[in-house]
């Protein structure tokens, strides 16, 4: 039986919050953040992705964050909001083990990068074999994660993604590559789910909120975007406006969203946490070796997203 389809819409790859001095995981803040995002109307959450500092966390910490997020959503009445889990490890065996742990902790699907540490020995055939082996054994479906910047430049093309989509336990791709042409080809070939029709249920996710509208036009299913940690309601408004036929409003708001997302993109994890701290009173810092931002940079981010946040406050 095919796995249940994920809902269309905006997903946030949530931050992992740490105590500022000890760098221990801050579970109460993680739970608070998950509930705030769900209340803002997000379709789903992703934990232990790139924004979640997965590479800075142990396996036990990863599962603790997943469990806390699922518990927080359930406690607040958001049992239907799915949580995806970044389950990438370097080996087939390790990734399968992590998928099994994630399933037991309540993950709806696993977000998985291609293997990349041994880049010189990693070709397309080995990448395809890796995903097939993991998908064969994982108790939860896979969403493939195409993010060349995180995997030594490996950029899976549409032909490979379309072939992998034929596996019954591979249910989507996140296109952090930003290639809307590739997203369009994959969405078309897989009959991807959209706000207008269920199609096959395959999910073609844009990977940044600055091309939310472009993803919709391309036949996409949703957005998994770091900016949704900061301006979730604006992200949802762009998505809903287009989906409900108000294209002019969607275009207008997308321009604001694209401008506001850029300062966050440039400042990455530290910048997003800084913006959350400025506007919501929590956030803190990344784990080392990522640097803490100087006050001048914090102020610049605050100013850079001001227009977007003024709209966010009205929604």
Swiss-Prot record:
Task performed by this protein: Mediates the conversion of 2-dehydro-3-deoxy-L-galactonate to pyruvate and L-glyceraldehyde in D-galacturonate catabolic process.
EC code(s) of this entry: 4.1.2.54
Pathway the protein contributes to: Carbohydrate acid metabolism
Protein name according to UniProt: L-threo-3-deoxy-hexylosonate aldolase
Keyword Lyase: yes
CDD domains: DHDPS-like
Catalytic activity: 2-dehydro-3-deoxy-L-galactonate = L-glyceraldehyde + pyruvate
InterPro entries: Aldolase_TIM (IPR013785), DapA-like (IPR002220)
Keywords: Carbohydrate metabolism, Lyase
Entries under Pfam families matching the protein: DHDPS
GO molecular function terms listed in the Swiss-Prot or TrEMBL record: 4-hydroxy-tetrahydrodipicolinate synthase activity; aldehyde-lyase activity
UniProt binding sites for substrate: 50-51
Disruption phenotype: Cells are unable to grow on D-galacturonate.
GO biological process, one term: D-galacturonate catabolic process
Organism (species): Hypocrea jecorina
SMART domains linked to this entry: DHDPS
Similarity annotation: Belongs to the DapA family.
Catalytic EC class: lyase
Cross-referenced PANTHER family: DIHYDRODIPICOLINATE SYNTHASE, DIHYDRODIPICOLINATE SYNTHETASE FAMILY PROTEIN (AFU_ORTHOLOGUE AFUA_3G11920)
Active site (record annotation): 174 (schiff-base intermediate with substrate)
Record-marked site positions (Involved in proton transfer during cleavage): 145
Domain of life: Eukaryota
SUPFAM superfamilies: Aldolase
């Amino acid at each position: 039986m095919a796995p249940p389809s994920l809902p269309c819409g905006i997903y946030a790859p949530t931050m992992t919050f740490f105590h500022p001095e000890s760098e221990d995981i801050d579970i109460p803040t993680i739970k608070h953040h998950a509930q705030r995002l769900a209340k803002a109307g997000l379709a789903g959450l992703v934990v232990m992705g790139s924004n979640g500092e997965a590479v800075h966390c142990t396996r036990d910490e990863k599962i603790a964050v997943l469990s806390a997020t699922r518990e927080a959503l359930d406690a607040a009445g958001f049992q239907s909001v799915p949580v995806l889990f970044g389950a990438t490890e370097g080996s087939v065996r390790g990734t399968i083990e992590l998928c099994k742990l994630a399933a037991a902790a309540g993950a709806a699907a696993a977000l998985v990068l291609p293997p990349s540490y041994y880049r010189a020995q990693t070709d397309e055939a080995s990448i395809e074999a890796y995903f097939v082996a993991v998908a064969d054994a994982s108790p939860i479906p896979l969403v493939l994660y195409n993010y060349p910047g995180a995997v030594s430049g490996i950029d899976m093309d549409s032909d490979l993604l379309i072939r992998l989509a034929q596996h019954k336990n591979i249910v989507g791709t996140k296109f952090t590559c930003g290639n809307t042409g590739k997203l369009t080809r994959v969405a078309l070939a897989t009959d991807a789910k959209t706000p207008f029709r269920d199609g096959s249920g395959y999910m073609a996710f844009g990977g940044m909120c600055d091309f939310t509208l472009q993803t919709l036009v391309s036949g996409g299913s949703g957005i998994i975007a770091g900016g949704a940690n900061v301006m979730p309601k604006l992200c949802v408004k762009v998505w809903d406006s287009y989906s409900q036929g108000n294209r002019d409003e969607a275009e207008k708001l997308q321009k604001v969203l694209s401008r506001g997302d850029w300062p966050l993109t440039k400042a990455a994890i530290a910048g997003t946490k800084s913006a959350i701290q400025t506007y919501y009173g929590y956030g803190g810092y990344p784990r080392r070796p990522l640097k803490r931002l100087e006050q001048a940079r914090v102020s610049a981010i605050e100013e850079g997203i001001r227009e977007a946040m003024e709209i966010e406050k009205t929604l």
